[in-house]
């Protein structure tokens, strides 16, 4: 049964749980400056989950009574209901999510609520909350990457034979297929998912039990708490458990790589959608117009994703800078770890959700792609390879074809436009089968090794990714 207010000590009416040590209250400006509840309240459910596991362990170890545990569980359920209903009162004076919840718990269940913090500190408490939250975010992001890869592979399968120019230095290089090009991004995002999964292994270690920095003298069972919360194990050093945020930095580094890959894809979508290129169109729901130019259809989503990549990269640098000068163990600097971390996860989640939808609706303009591939002597390497297969050293073949390209530029024609006699003037080993080699279809079909751009290989790879991400 909850104590009446008159039976409770002054904690219930104090602004801070630690204020008994001080002779004067902090100023209102300092309260605003040091408070984190406006942003860390998003950890509330994870904070409650961690507290319930901690209370269960305390009761199992005989540190608190079974009645205390029952009261704490009842109070926490009430707090969860209030949070879900939007009626929980978050107070700036109480600094953070932890003290707000603890204060309300004491109001609801009295002394049992004041016993909850036995054997722990906000230092190991917040480290646990962040890891619980981040673990869930990683699982969600891995699934969003799966969805994006599935969408890309589906479009790739439909365009396994759609020929486009491949570029190096933004100059026409060799023919590839649009399906092959999209599968390059499917590979990148696959590695991104692997990085997140690997990061999760290091996130999934329990800090709780480290207390402020040196552990606790109570006979706690950290392994029980770890098992209850689904952690793979416990952090093995109490100083390290509360002081480092390398797991958050590692996540932000993985997020920066994902956004970098998104940014590269975005750049190509913007270029491909330009009327000067005209390779694709995006669905209207991903574009906006102009307030002055009625004809405009702007690829705002990929453009903004490019910009948000800088934002995510900035959060990574901020976290690295935050950690670099801190001595062991916990310092108030670490309060600054959350907003950038939260924003990174939010930005990445929204970006991947949008891109999975947008990628699946790309409208391909195959004729424009093919026309572009016919420019720039995209099959010049095929002619060089043809000569090598007839005994010419590659460097000699390279020189022969370079002369042919230069002559064609002067004449305003392509290598495929030359007659057999004209081609044989460059080297007598050239035969009538050369004209099949110099076609776009012949060029891509010849590259049938694993990882090549032959349509049959592209179909196999697309089907593999589709099955992998189903």
Swiss-Prot record:
Keywords from the UniProt entry: Amino-acid biosynthesis, Arginine biosynthesis, Cytoplasm, Lyase
Gene3D superfamilies: Fumarase/aspartase (C-terminal domain) (1.10.40.30), Fumarase/aspartase (Central domain) (1.20.200.10), Fumarase/aspartase (N-terminal domain) (1.10.275.10)
Compartments, record wording: Cytoplasm
EC number: 4.3.2.1
Segments traversing the membrane: none
NCBIfam families according to UniProt: argH
Record's protein name: Argininosuccinate lyase
Native source species: Bordetella avium (strain 197N)
Gene: argH
């Amino acid at each position: 049964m909850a104590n009446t207010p008159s039976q409770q000590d002054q904690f219930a009416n104090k602004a801070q749980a630690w204020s008994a040590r001080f002779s004067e209250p902090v100023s209102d400006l300092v309260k605003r400056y040091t408070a984190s509840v406006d942003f860390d309240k998003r950890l509330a459910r994870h904070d409650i989950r961690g507290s319930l596991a901690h209370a269960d362990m305390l009761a199992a170890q005989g540190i608190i009574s079974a009645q205390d545990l029952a009261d704490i569980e009842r109070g926490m359920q009430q707090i969860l209901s209030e949070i879900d209903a939007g009626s929980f009162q978050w107070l700036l004076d109480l600094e953070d999510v932890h003290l707000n919840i603890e204060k309300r718990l004491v109001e609801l269940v009295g002394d049992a609520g004041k016993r909850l913090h036995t054997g722990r500190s906000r230092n190991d408490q917040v480290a646990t909350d962040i890891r619980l939250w981040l673990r869930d975010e990683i699982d969600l992001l891995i699934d969003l990457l799966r969805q994006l890869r599935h969408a890309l592979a589906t479009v790739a399968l439909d365009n396994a034979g759609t020929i486009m120019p491949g570029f190096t230095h933004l100059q026409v290089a060799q023919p590839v297929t649009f399906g092959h090009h999209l599968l390059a991004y499917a590979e990148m995002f696959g590695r991104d998912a692997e990085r997140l999964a690997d990061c999760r292994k290091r996130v999934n270690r329990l800090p709780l039990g480290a207390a402020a920095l040196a552990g606790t003298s109570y006979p706690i069972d950290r392994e029980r708490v770890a098992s209850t919360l689904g952690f793979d194990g416990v952090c093995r050093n109490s100083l390290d458990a509360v002081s480092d945020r390398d797991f958050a930095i590692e996540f932000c580094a993985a997020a920066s790589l994902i956004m970098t890959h998104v940014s590269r894809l975005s750049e190509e979508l913007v270029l491909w959608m330009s009327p000067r290129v005209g390779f694709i169109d995006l669905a209207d729901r991903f574009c906006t117009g102009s307030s002055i130019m009625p004809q405009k259809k702007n690829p705002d989503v990929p453009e903004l994703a490019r910009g948000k990549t800088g934002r995510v990269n900035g959060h990574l640098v901020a976290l690295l800078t935050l950690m670099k000068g801190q001595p062991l163990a916990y310092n108030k600097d670490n309060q600054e770890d959350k907003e950038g971390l939260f924003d990174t996860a939010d930005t990445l989640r929204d970006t991947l959700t949008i891109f999975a939808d947008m990628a699946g609706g790309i409208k391909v303009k195959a004729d424009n792609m093919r026309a572009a591939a016919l420019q720039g002597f995209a099959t010049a390497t095929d002619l060089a390879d043809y000569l090598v297969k007839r005994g010419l050293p590659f460097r000699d073949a390279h020189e022969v074809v370079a002369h042919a390209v230069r002559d064609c530029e002067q004449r305003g024609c392509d290598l495929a436009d030359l007659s057999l006699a004209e081609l044989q003037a460059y080297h007598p080993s050239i035969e009538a089968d050369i004209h099949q080699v110099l076609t776009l279809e012949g060029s891509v079909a010849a590259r049938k090794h694993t990882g090549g751009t032959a349509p049959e290989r592209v179909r196999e790879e697309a089907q593999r990714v589709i099955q992998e991400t189903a």
